[in-house]
Amino acid sequence: MANPLYHKHIISINDLSRDDLELVLATAAGLKANPQPELLKHKVIASCFFEASTRTRLSFETSMHRLGASVVGFADGSNTSLGKKGETLADTISVISTYVDAIVMRHPQEGARMASEFSGNVPVLNAGDGNQHPTQTLLDLFTIQETQGRLSNLSIAMVGDLKYGRTVHSLTQALAKFEGNRFYFIAPDALAMPAYILKMLEEKGIEYSSHGSIEEVVPELDILYMTRVQKERLDPSEYANVKAQFVLAADLAGAANLKVLHPLPRIDEIATDVDKTPHAYYFQQAGNGIFARSALALVVNADLAL
C-alpha cells in the first residue's frame, strides 16, 4: 500500500494514528535489526534548532547521516537572519524549504502555527516546541514495546513535572490510542497533569489516578517514567520539599519487568545507584532515539510501498 506519511508534517503526536505509529515503530525495529546506510542518499535535511538541545539534535543528525542523507542547519537561532535581522519565522523556514527535502525544527512557538505559517512543500518534523515533543514519544513507544513486548494493557506511572513537561503530554496521548492502559500521575499539585489531558482520558474511558509518592504505586507498574521537577517553576521552599519527595532510589520494589525511563537530562530525581539495577533503561531509551528518528525521517521522505 502507499505510504500514508509521505511528505506529511509531524508536529503533534496527534498527527499520527495508531496505524501510523505502528508503521514508524515497525520501521524503527527493522532499522535497528538491519541498518540501511543509503536509504536517504542524495537527500538533504535541515536541522534548525532555535532552542538548546543535546540528545534530540545529535540523535536526529546522526540518524540522517546513518541513512546516507546530508545535514545542514544551525544550533543557535540567534545567529540567523531571524535572530539578527528580524526576519519572521515563517519567512526563514519558507526559504530553507527551497534548499532541502525535509526540515527538523525545535522552536518555543507551538507547532501547529509553526507549520501552517510557512509556504513550503517539504515535511516539517517537530523536534520539540512549547507543548509537544512527538519524536521523543516515538522513541519512548519504541522502548516500551522493546522492553514489554506490547503497547497495550500496561500500567504506567509518570512522575515529576507533569504540567510543563511536554514529553508526558505527548506520551499520554499516544498510549491512549492503545487499549487497556492504566495511568498513575505523581506530581506536586502545582505541577499536576493538565486538565485537557485528564479530560481526554475520561472521554476515552481510560483509567487514571493521582498519587503523592512513588512508593505507593511501584508494585503495580510496568513502566515508571521519571521527569525532573523544574526548579524555575516553583518557589524555593516548595521546590526543596517536592525535590525530596520525588527521588527514586535503588531499593524500589518493582516487578521483574519494570523499566524506569526518563527523557533526560536527569538532575537529582534518579539516584545514580539506580543505574546499576535491572530496572534502569533510560540510557538505552536515549539510544533508541537514533532508530525512532531514522524511521520517521525515512517514512516522510521515501514514497515507499510499505
UniProtKB/Swiss-Prot annotation:
Superkingdom of this protein's organism: Bacteria
Sites binding L-aspartate sit at K85, R166, R228
Pfam families (UniProt xref): OTCace, OTCace_N
| One Gene Ontology term, aspect cellular component | cytosol
Note whether Transferase occurs among the keywords.
yes
Record GO biological process: 'de novo' pyrimidine nucleobase biosynthetic process; 'de novo' UMP biosynthetic process; amino acid metabolic process
The entry describes its oligomerization and partners as: Heterododecamer (2C3:3R2) of six catalytic PyrB chains organized as two trimers (C3), and six regulatory PyrI chains organized as three dimers (R2).
Protein known as: Aspartate carbamoyltransferase catalytic subunit
Q: What lineage, starting at the top, does this entry show? A: Bacteria, Pseudomonadati, Pseudomonadota, Gammaproteobacteria, Enterobacterales
